[in-house]
Amino acid sequence: DPNIQHGEYFDRQQKASFDLSAGMSYKFMSEAPNIDRFSKTSGTISAGFWHLNQGKRLTLSDEQADIKMVFMTDLLFAMGQDKKAAFNPWVLGMLQGSAYELTAGGDFRFFLKQSDKYSVSRAIFSIGGAYRLNDAAMARIMFDYANYGIGVAYEMNTSSLKEASKGFG
C-alpha cells in the first residue's frame, strides 16, 4: 500500500562534491614471469593520497564535515629460493589526520600444482600472519587456483580493548 505512513522523509535534492585522489605504483621483477614458478625476487611499491582537496562531506541533512586527507603506502616483496616456494613480506601504512595504521606481515606461498601439458592453471597455498601496531595480531590462509582465490583470516586483539574482547577479533 503506497499510502502507509513509514516515517522516512528526505528532501530529494541531488548533492555532489568533488573529491581528488592520486597515486602511483612501481613493480619490479628479477626475471620474466613464468606460470610454473615464483620469481626469485619481485615486489611492488605503492603510494596514494585520497581527499587531496580536503572538501566537505555532504550528508542528507545540512550538516557538513571536513574530510581529512588520507595517505597510504604499501610495500610487497616476494622472495622465492627454490622457485616452488616463496616468502612474501609486506608493510601497509595509512595516515588520516591524527589517526594512523601500520601493519606488517608475511606469507609463505607454496606451489601445489603447476601447469601441465594441456593447461596453464596453477594451484598455490599460502599461510601467513601480520601485526597491526598497538591493535591486533592476524593469521590467514589462502588457496589460489587459476585466477580465483579463497581464504580465511582471523584477528586476535592485542590492544587495551583486550579485556573487553577477551583477545578475540
Where do the model's predicted regions map?
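Outer membrane beta-barrel transmembrane domains
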Residues: 61-80, 85-169
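Outer-membrane pore/translocation modules
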Residues: 1-78
